[in-house]
Amino acid sequence: MDLSRIFKAYDVRGVVPDELNPTIARRIGAAFAVWADAPEIALGRDARLSSPDLAAALREGITSRDVDVVDLGFASTDLLYFASGSLDLPAVMITASHNPKDYNGLKFCLAGAKPVGEDSGLADIEALAEKGDEIIGEGHGAVRPRDLLDAYVEHVLRFTDVEHMRPLTVAVDTANGMGGLVVPPVMARLPVTLHHLYAELDGTFPNHPADPIDPENQRDLKAAVLRHGADVGMAFDGDADRVFLVDERAQDVSGSVLTALVAAAMLEREPGAKIVHNLICSWAVPEVIREHGGIPIRTRVGHSFIKQVMAETGAIFGGEHSGHYYFRDNFNADSGLIAAVIALGELSRSNRPLSELLRPYRRYAASGEINTHVDDPQATIERVAEAFRDGRPDRLDGLTVEFDDWWFNVRPSNTEPLLRLNVEARTEELLEAETQEVLAVIEGEGAPS
């Protein structure tokens, strides 16, 4: 039984039922119970049409090993992390996040919301599950429903000053995903007029894919911001762990800009603290951290690296350009909703439009991530390194090369034969020129002039 197609670097993900189905989920549940070696495991699920059957199979697999299940029912991924942290239990989330409706998947964590990835247990779980039905036990663990939504809402609200927040108008698009479960009860506790698009939980995602990183999927949100004169717009992905903002003019707020805003807010509360950012964040992020008296720590791309470095260094916050935001006081786990609530608090306190509040952080022009299919990613990276040898290189993750006025990072995908390129420059003109120059080398068509 070969499960390598669905076991990825950080989770399990595949097309239902061809790649992931109740039979496989049952075995994976039993395998996780054996590997985690805990008396109880928390289980949550998103609203995909296949999630109830996969949840039933996971419960069967887990309880067959005489392990009890704390069944959260519907959950966002960050609600599941809260359950794992507050109850001190290993946990499984059934979700395929922003993937199309035909997909589903599983995210795992250990007690205290500690990450489980390819190098921290996922490969062991895969090996156990590949034993097939022999991993299924004959035990009879109990299943206990548990509703943690109210406790989770209280937890999220601790990250901002609710009492002194001024009235705001907020547009939210949860894309029929799990944000429809967690966003309304949080916003109901704030002085917010909420315009909520696609709030209903619907695993067919009838309005648009639950993937806000694609600009096409933010069109309705941006129209709502302008139509209602909203102070801010928020787009959540399918399992509601990532958030993307737009300002009152319906202009994008990049993950780096929101990281800088949240970092500044956190450093006001804890001066001198350490803050983690990944290496494709804007130059603005470490600059803002230093300007506010903090210590920036640069990491590889990927949530397991951020969480590991936060745990090792005691950092209070970590941000990724991809829309993930991690908090020490949230068990080092990520929560788009906590980041959104902190942003609302800062917007309220500033008494300015969001575009003005963010102007000091919008310092550079960025390309966004550009993917290029290549036959040999590593050989291509070496060709790029040679072509741009006049810059300042580092190899923390792929290849980063810095110049005085611009920088780029190129790194291979974990799962496909492609390279991911990010470029940033001091001006739009320089960005355009240098992006084309790097792409020409990647595509084997040129070298820098």
Enumerate the language-model features and the residues they cover:
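An N-terminal, well-structured beta->alpha segment
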Residues: 1-60, 64-66, 145-168
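N-terminal small/polar loop signature for handling phosphorylated ligands or for N-terminal nucleophile
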Residues: 41-104, 157, 185-246
